[in-house]
Amino acid sequence: MYMDPISDLLLRIKTGTKTKRNSVVVKTSKLVTNILEILKNEGYIEGFKTESIGKNKNQTVVNLKYRNNVSSITGLKQISKPGLRIYSEAQKLPKVLNGLGIAIISTSMGLMTDKNAKKNNVGGEVIAYVW
């Protein structure tokens, strides 16, 4: 059975924050690494590290971020799914919680936040909302 790497990543992070874990382990891919880089730059996670677990197999350990025992990530929602892709133009990119959250957008220039996509005037596939 095929498991979408984006939904797997978001589900593991969501479960980890609900159970107050310090870190979660996810499968490694370029897409997952790019999403984690955005979450790190926006201050939603402390960091991540890729580890080798065998021949041609890697896993990524994501260090979750907490402030006063409250998770930095209040919510995660996958928007575009393998069965239903959601695209948006640069002018119509969604605002998450009136700008308090971010939307992760896959553009022709790579993955970026909704703010960066508007600044660069590029649209693309809306991957997920994070707040």
UniProtKB/Swiss-Prot annotation:
Organism domain of life: Bacteria
InterPro entries, sorted: Ribosomal_uS8, Ribosomal_uS8_CS, Ribosomal_uS8_sf
Cellular component GO terms held in the UniProt record: ribonucleoprotein complex; ribosome
Keyword annotations from UniProtKB, A to Z: Ribonucleoprotein, Ribosomal protein, RNA-binding, rRNA-binding
GO molecular function, one term: structural constituent of ribosome
Coiled coil: none
Function of the protein: One of the primary rRNA binding proteins, it binds directly to 16S rRNA central domain where it helps coordinate assembly of the platform of the 30S subunit.
Protein name from the UniProt record: Small ribosomal subunit protein uS8
Species of the source: Malacoplasma penetrans (strain HF-2) (Mycoplasma penetrans)
